[in-house]
Amino acid sequence: MSTSRPDASADLPAWLQYLESIHAKAIDLGLDRVRQVAGRLDLSLDGVKFMVGGTNGKGSTCAMLESILLAAGYRVGLYTSPHLIDFNERARINGEIASDAALVQQFEAVEAARGDISLTYFEFTTLAILRLFAQSRLDAVVLEVGLGGRLDAVNIVDADCSIITSIDLDHTDWLGDTREKIGFEKAHIYRAGRPAIC
């Protein structure tokens, strides 16, 4: 794998290959690095921010919420992971999958902002998609948590409404070996005084 930064003519596959090589670990939970880079980018999201966590059913819940909001006439951004076939599936604006060009533009911005801060693939791509949404003047954003909640990159967003679909034993190496420990991690997507759905 190439570790050199993609040049201005690089396509999305070249960027994705590069992103797999810039951090020593595939999963490195924590928000310090992500917040530091986010502070160098304009990630101000307009509209209502929904965050969805849980062991199972996150993607389905996000898709249903997106569908309801679109049917009501709102401009909606949807971020889910992982993707099934193409990376672009992770970011949708008004039901349309983000283009390669739109994603590459955001990757270039995150790369310029991060300096020497090492980010995981998920952290880097999360920041890029949040920046895409911030520039899209959306009425609502639906964000799926990647792993857990408390230390997941998506949790840098101050959600207006947080949803936890279910809690079960999963990713026990990172989240704990009991439902209580896993629930503690996931509950950190809730915000004081704001709607919490479970």
Language-model segments: residues:
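Hydrophobic/aromatic beta-strand patches that form the interior of the parallel beta-sheet core
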Residues: 50, 77-79, 161-163, 197
